[in-house]
């Protein structure tokens, strides 16, 4: 699921929004609220799980394990008789949640690598293109392509190994998690070929990926419920941004990807 600030950005002007590679929703803060998460549960999770189980000739019974984030409503526990929804204990996400045991880290690494690869390719194909223009050309449509391709790159062994702490009996080999060191090294090598990133190092990349995760707090949700929550229908409605002087030092690499 991807939550954006606009229901139909300019980059999707000629696209069918029902055939995007992600479950697409929007609000003016680009936050996953309880309403959006319930929408995902009903219109994405349930149909896809049902389709998968039919392909495997399995009965429609499923378990959804989620953390206690403010945007995850407890009412989901009673929404479908064939799906059991369980919430993890508070403050255990980083320790137990399967996605936090290697899957998210692998996805982030693949996404960052593909982003730098795309930028470098564009610069090589058009010598007159500046790095600033290259970043500006990276719109939400290209972002979704990267998201889909990065998710597809996550190996089944990585997904299997993520259950090591909660369900070790089903893990085939706990050492099968993707070699992130290799991927991070590849990112550094690619980034250093881009003008302005020649001083990027492993610490910059690893810190950037660690800072991706910022869960909503209760205060965040209170703010979004107290202010108008309707997403922009189109990016035509957005105010024109003032030009920002580009900073491509290693210290600014995190901000570029946020």
Regions found by a protein language model. Give the residues of each.
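Acidic, serine/proline-rich intrinsically disordered regulatory segments
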Residues: 2-258
